[in-house]
Amino acid sequence: MNDNLKSFLDQKVAQYNRPEFIANDPVSIPHMFTKKQDIEIMGFWAATLAWGQRVTIIKKCRELITLMDGAPYDFIINHEEPDLKKLLHFKHRTFNDIDTLYFIAFFRQHYENYDSLEDAFVPSNKSVILNDSEGSIREYALQQAEGDPTVETALNYFRSYFFSLPDFPHRTKKHVSSPSQKSTCKRLNMFLRWMVRNDNNGVDFSIWNKLKPADLICPCDLHVDRVARHLKLITRKQTDWQTAVELTEGLKELDPLDPVKYDFALFGLGIEERWGIEGIMPEF
């Protein structure tokens, strides 16, 4: 372990893992709610729409909340067909009304059967049979017989489950990634961080417990990737799922129980301090 690096990053975690930074971050969207299902729905949606400028992301999420009458869970469960008309013009970048309506359809069928979105990632029963995105039948054994589920298993399961409704729009598949596609799954890993981490600092929610903080994979976006490479936490040339795993394994050397807390440090250095864009980056 590099003690100097750990000390430096721990200081940066303390600097950026604070409620003062919530307002300007997409995590502010689920923080608008107290009902668990509203937090899950808008946390997932905010993470999905999290590309581009943060001001725009937050603005579009607030627009979506307004279109759902300020109560996403209630709207999704109780809406009637005419209620969906006002959503037909919602768009953020390549996310459009077709995607919006499918998200609502998925959430409705899920919450009619489960109390929490957590079951969409780690079902309560040992194995689940469902129609996968190619229309064939698969069985997902979620490692609960031999041990705890992994994030990789959970994300691969989630994508197949998410697109298990009949006649799902194929265009929407680009908005939900998975490790099996070699994606870093940055947005989904960020969402899982929000739902799972439990440091009581008031940023992450800690409303899920089937996955542990030690299981999480660090979200790896352009800014985190740039900083992590300078710190030699990433050596892999390409940026894919294995890159996110490599980064997380390096962070586990600093804190094996909560490696993803360093997302605050890496992201803060990349965005707030513009490491790699402005100024001189120290060596460790």
Residue map of PLM features:
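HhH-family (HhH-GPD) DNA N-glycosylase catalytic core used in base-excision repair
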Residues: 1-284
